[in-house]
Amino acid sequence: MKIAILSRDGTLYSCKRLREAAIQRGHLVEILDPLSCYMNINPAASSIHYKGRKLPHFDAVIPRIGTAITFYGTAALRQFEMLGSYPLNESVAIARARDKLRSMQLLARQGIDLPVTGIAHSPDDTSDLIDMVGGAPLVVKLVEGTQGIGVVLAETRQAAESVIDAFRGLNAYILVQEYIKEAQGCDIRCLVVGDEVVAAIERRAKEGDFRSNLHRGGAASVASITPQEREIAIKAARTMALDVAGVDILRANRGPLVMEVNASPGLEGIEKTTGIDIAGKMIRWIERHATTEYCLKTGG
């Protein structure tokens, strides 16, 4: 097969591993910067051009689209879909997962347990917003934040009010969430491919922090997950219509709670921690699903 990887930086670990895994299985691979793609949207002869040339047909496309370029990145992916390329995660699913509010609404509607959460835009009644989620301690987030940026633990009501007031000055969407103390600064990242959790790690925040993101200095170890955690991770990925997802789970006294569903999970931390060839599993999923039937279904 001919496979395109959409990424702004082909030197990143995840891109290199996916390219390596695809080549090892006999596929042709090209890494394309989605921002350098430009598109002819024409009912008779749609096409995608890249750095002065018209791109050939790709059997499959692997999107590694960063949050900052979601709009144009998903537009480029959508054009590949229109031309009959199989996407490892469809453009609409990626856009849905990047919208934190919509994601939580969809998960809640499917009965998937979440931390008690409130969301507001520059709330005038800060006190009621805090009461709505059960009071302090609580976590205050900017909806647009990633990798732990724009996330604050407010341990007292006064601190919560101060943080919310500060965020209000940014004219931003504010997410207020109960703090799961018993998780002790840890979460579980489940890597879902299709209908299977192929790997899981426990991420522990560095000392003095409560955010377990590896980008912020957190540590990782292999996690043994329960059948309930496995089920909720797969259900969350399926709810978001993602073939590949990183599902972040908190272990609360009342059971596992989904924190986030990531449409473009990094592979470095979880592959190096578990020793599992996740990139290879993703390529094998493509081999099973980038079929003639898919092209016929999409008009490719």
Curated annotation (Swiss-Prot):
Give the protein's cofactors. Answer: Mg(2+); Mn(2+)
Which GO terms of the molecular function aspect are on file?
Answer: ATP binding; metal ion binding; ribosomal S6-glutamic acid ligase activity
Translocase: is it a keyword of this entry?
no
Is the keyword Lipoprotein assigned to this protein?
A: no
Which residue intervals define the domain ATP-grasp in the entry? Answer: 104-287
Pfam families xref list: RimK (PF08443), Rimk_N (PF18030)
GO biological process annotations for this chain's record?
Answer: protein modification process; SOS response; translation
The entry marks the following residues as binding Mg(2+) 1, namely 248, 260
What SUPFAM superfamilies has UniProt attached to this entry?
Glutathione synthetase ATP-binding domain-like
Annotated residues that bind Mn(2+) 2 are located at 260, 262
Protein residues bound to Mn(2+) 1: 248, 260
Which residues of this UniProt protein bind Mg(2+) 2?
260, 262
**What PROSITE patterns does this protein map onto?**
ATP_GRASP
Q: Give the co-factor note.
A: Binds 2 magnesium or manganese ions per subunit.
Q: Where does ATP bind?
A: 141, 178-179, 187, 211-213
Q: Which NCBIfam families match?
A: PRK10446.1, rimK_fam
Similarity annotation: Belongs to the RimK family.
Q: What does this protein do?
A: An L-glutamate ligase that catalyzes the ATP-dependent post-translational addition of glutamate residues to the C-terminus of ribosomal protein bS6 (RpsF). Is also able to catalyze the synthesis of poly-alpha-glutamate in vitro, via ATP hydrolysis from unprotected glutamate as substrate. The number of glutamate residues added to either RpsF or to poly-alpha-glutamate changes with pH.
Question: Which HAMAP family does the record associate with it?
Answer: RimK
Spell out the PANTHER family in the cross-references: RIBOSOMAL PROTEIN BS6--L-GLUTAMATE LIGASE, RIBOSOMAL PROTEIN S6 MODIFICATION PROTEIN
How is this protein named in the record? Answer: Ribosomal protein bS6--L-glutamate ligase
- Which species is this UniProt entry from? Escherichia coli O139:H28 (strain E24377A / ETEC)
